């Protein structure tokens, strides 16, 4: 079975995108241009991107830069990204040129597509989803949020578990007396 495509158009022209993909032309172009490692971003990083896009949509609505319907659709779509519903559509290699623009656009296009489908209106990836944002801010912020999340949710609990195991082992060893490398009775 051959893969089917749709034609997407952006500021750089038309591009063929897999028909079921939630991303658009910019992401598909980045995948073609930067096939470096086949490594993808972590769940915590994608979640952080969704949280940033959601927060920005709320702020843009509060500042009357984004109408309520668009904002709510973007917020709902970003929540789906946060929940991990579209991780498979984050296809840009972690190694790419620039300041993560391709990754930022990957998120913008996914959220735009989901929001546009739910609202039946055209929510633009740059003009609406990425409003008041720059890749130079979004990507480092997502990196920091993801790092803190990993530290709090994974590293600290594992270190605490290790400490507890070592304390138990130390207490056990302390109770055992040794004489000539044998346990004492």
Which residues make up each language-model segment?
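Conserved, well-structured ligand/cofactor-binding cores
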Residues: 1-184
């Amino acid at each position: 079975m051959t893969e089917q495509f749709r034609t997407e158009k952006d500021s750089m022209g038309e591009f063929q995108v897999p028909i079921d993909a939630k991303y658009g032309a910019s992401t598909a172009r980045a995948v073609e241009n930067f096939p470096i490692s086949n490594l993808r971003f972590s769940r915590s990083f994608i979640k952080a991107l969704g949280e940033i896009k959601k927060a920005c949509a709320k702020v843009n609505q509060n500042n009357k830069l984004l109408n309520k319907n668009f904002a709510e659709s973007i917020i709902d779509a970003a929540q789906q990204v946060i929940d991990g519903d579209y991780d498979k559509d984050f296809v840009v290699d972690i190694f790419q040129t620039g300041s993560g623009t391709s990754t930022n656009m990957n998120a913008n296009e996914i959220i735009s597509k989901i929001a546009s489908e739910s609202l039946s209106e055209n929510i633009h990836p740059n003009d609406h989803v990425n409003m008041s944002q720059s890749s130079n801010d979004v990507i480092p912020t997502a990196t920091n949020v993801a790092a803190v999340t990993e530290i709090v949710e994974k590293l600290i609990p594992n270190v605490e578990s290790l400490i507890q195991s070592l304390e138990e082992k130390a207490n056990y060893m302390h109770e055992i007396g040794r004489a000539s490398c044998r346990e004492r009775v």
